């Protein structure tokens, strides 16, 4: 009987500690904010701000479906996908004779590293 009480007490203490640790993490952003417009300090002028999309979006990994894996040149059993913070709408502006695209709205979408 005493042994059962000891195990029960130890289990309750362990669960309490784990719950406390788990509640610390949702309050942290881990250095990456959500995808939103931020002012670009390099190109912005007083009265003429230039905005760009900055922030983080999700990424995930999952097992590659067998049908897809059979068609790959180099089969991989894990498939990953990611989205990037990109401009939904832009407006062209000229700052110091430099043509810029001022972002007006952002969202998480497919990553295009090769596009400007």
From Swiss-Prot:
Annotated localization: Secreted
Give the GO biological process terms: G protein-coupled receptor signaling pathway; positive regulation of steroid biosynthetic process; regulation of signaling receptor activity; thyroid hormone generation
Q: What keywords sit in the KW lines? A: Disulfide bond, Glycoprotein, Hormone, Secreted, Signal
Tell me any Pfam family this protein matches.
Answer: Hormone_6
Per UniProt, what is one GO molecular function of this protein?
protein heterodimerization activity
Return the InterPro entries for the record: Cystine-knot_cytokine (IPR029034), Glyco_hormone (IPR000476)
Q: Is Signal included in the keywords of this UniProt record?
A: yes
Residues annotated as glycosylated are 77, 102
Task: Check the UniProt entry and state the signal peptide residues, or none.
Answer: 1-24
Q: Report quaternary structure and partners.
A: Heterodimer. Glycoprotein hormones are heterodimers composed of a common alpha chain described here and a unique beta chain which confers their biological specificity to the different hormones.
Q: Which PANTHER family match?
A: GLYCOPROTEIN HORMONE ALPHA CHAIN, GLYCOPROTEIN HORMONES ALPHA CHAIN
The protein depicted here goes by the name: Glycoprotein hormones alpha chain
What gene codes for this chain?
cga
